[in-house]
């Protein structure tokens, strides 16, 4: 199962039938921001591990949108007993950025024209497109595109200000595998080779 949006429907499904998670071979999610890294030239990196670490409050992108929209469903999904729990969060997806002129050159296949149309709308506000969901889809078929670490992700639901925040704790016996790095060149190769 691949999840690239807020987890309301999946959380509801799991709540309605708690046996469903155990029937899944794997769940791959674009969700959360397991670690926080600034890509503005300061090279500041911090782990998002401690509830007392409130410096992240003012940092853009620390709470990922899918988790923010429905933190309770997100918590339920991450707590479900799935055979394999895989996450690609903002810590890796935000590294896959393309400028408008690059997209115009690359998105020339007929199947990509609707994607380019959507990207053009995005460019009106952002001047870039970020490949959040495509990385999640590519990693489903090509796990070598990311370096994963095992651990435990917990979702904040008690704090009004931090609702949806993801707490990451590395643990070799943990239930979650989280992408910590991405091979950009390999990602673009896998993504676009299907359109040749």
Predicted regions: what they are:
Residues 50-52, 65-196:
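Conformational coupling and interaction surfaces
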Residues 1-87, 93:
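Active-site histidine-anchored catalytic micro-motif
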